[in-house]
């Protein structure tokens, strides 16, 4: 019985090979050797899978499009050796699109091959209308961590991936890019804080979600963490985004529309905390003051002694522990402005009221 089953299985695979060969011969006879089948690719792709040198030679003699076959192979999980075989058949210079496709697919083995053996530049920029840009940016959009690490370790310019990391709301990748030299001020086409706020707020808009992939609460919290990271590293809390205005205006308007939206609230609080100018938004005074109250409560301000010249440090055991651990909130080496008590009290009085001198003073640059 086992012998019979093995024979039947062998016949099945033999038949499959015969079918592929028959398909190739049909394509040759009908002069369609470069037709790209969605599953099998061109006639040359089939021949490579069959490892049939005779058919490969025949196809080459008929001027088969090798580049088309290579491109298909990269996008369809061909092995590195199969792709190397295809490339060995070509005498022309390899186009950047091969590297783009390998990066887009997250094929670290191919990325290494193209860079180390075929001398592609680690900072290659792809001219593609849909997914163009530096290959590090493309890897970041795909969140291919192993490819990102490889590119950075081999000299990729870290700032090339920053905007993609922000659009993806991926704080881990953003931190990695900053470790390799990226900053919040590297001459980007758009302000990073503005890009992030614009991305975060539509992503949490119910109308927006109906026509796109819905975001989870965890995904949205990534935007908040990413904003915090940017502000801690010198991001501009008064950034403007195209026709929408300043980021604090965008965030406050969204919060007024959805008062229970925690993401909008957290964005507003972070921007205010790091110096956003709210003095122009008189119609939002009550909301702004309530946010400042929450900031004070979050920071557990007890009295004036809680503020140091270079940053806020609570006298509570919990905050002290955070400080010792290097919490970014109390890190006095941060590039962002964090207000001292003297700076806060110098501001004009607010309508907050309250029980402490700090609450009675204007809070955070309004």
UniProtKB/Swiss-Prot annotation:
Keywords: ANK repeat, Repeat. Pfam families: Ank_2 (PF12796). ANK repeats lie at residues 39-68, 94-124, 131-160, 162-186, 210-239, 250-280. SUPFAM superfamilies: Ankyrin repeat (SSF48403). Gene3D superfamilies: Ankyrin repeat-containing domain (1.25.40.20). InterPro entries: Ankyrin_rpt, Ankyrin_rpt-contain_sf, Cul2-RING_E3_ligase_SR. PANTHER family: ANKYRIN REPEAT FAMILY PROTEIN (PTHR46224). This is Putative ankyrin repeat protein RBE_0601. It comes from Rickettsia bellii (strain RML369-C).
